[in-house]
Amino acid sequence: MTLRTFVSALGVILALILTAVAVPTAWIDQNIVKEEGFVRIAGELGNDPEFQDRLATAAVGTFESSVDLPGPIQSLAADALRSAASGMQSWSDYPQAWEETVRNSHRLNFGAANQPEEAATTTALVLDISPLVRLIRDHFAEATRIRIDVPAESLVSLGEPSHRQLVERVAAFAPLWWVAALGALISMLLALVAARRRSLVLVFLGLGGLALAALWTAGADLAGGVVGSLSSANGVAELFKQEFLTAAKAGFGEWILMAAVASGGVFVAGVIASVVSGRRGSRSASS
């Protein structure tokens, strides 16, 4: 094996290893750590009837526990709250309240600078349903003409205190995906420059990319199983975790599909280039 072949092979291996790290880390940064991506994924839970029913019940319970109504209007309030628990999702201002819920929750979990002490010490993840509680308050005020103050924050626990360390590590390291991506690009260019037959480099990069797509798929299933097995604080937390994992796996699956298609294209290009260069070599040898 010549030095050029060794350097080229090393470049291919490094490019694949760094790509294996860069792609899932970039996805996590764009879709979990960054607020807009998190809102896009978690926002889909707003269309899940079972989850929203449980969330509405939790919001109504929080509202009931935060107010002290006079006896004469308690029966009227009970009817209004039952209506809220069963029909909140049909309110025109519900989607906006749910999006605000998701945004507030992301800031509490990933914007660690100004987190309240309760969120920092009791659980790794919390869902701030105060926008939904305020929504119930506003509709309750319309029905009863009674305006009631509610807590600024209404937190639903989504995990255990030990889970926060994982969240903090993800938030700290995921934004550094570009370092691995840059290293993969440099390694790939080094492999192409050092190679005697660049077409073979493309072939191996394509095959490696297809293998990585399979590895990412298996890794996503494994990670989903591990996270899914973690204990949840309550029924709302368990349902949120399962539905969010399903949405996240589907989102990452789209990236895997694009990577597989790109890798297949690189592989085909390498095969074609290898065939063409082989024919040229045969012609020059015969002449």
Regions found by a protein language model. Give the residues of each.
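Membrane-helix interfacial "entry" motifs
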Residues: 1, 5, 46, 167, ...
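Acidic, carboxylate-rich catalytic segments that either coordinate divalent cations
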Residues: 254-277
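Membrane-helix exit/juxtamembrane interface segments
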Residues: 24-47, 200-203, 214-232
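Juxtamembrane interface at the cytosolic side of transmembrane helices
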Residues: 1-13, 177-228, 272-287
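Terminal targeting segments of Actinobacterial cell-envelope proteins
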Residues: 1-2, 154-170, 236-240, 244, ...
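Helical transmembrane-bundle signal
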Residues: 18, 22, 184-187, 213, ...
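Cytosolic/nucleoplasmic, non-transmembrane interface domains of endomembrane
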Residues: 9-184
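Membrane-proximal extracellular juxtamembrane segment immediately upstream
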Residues: 161, 165-168, 207-262
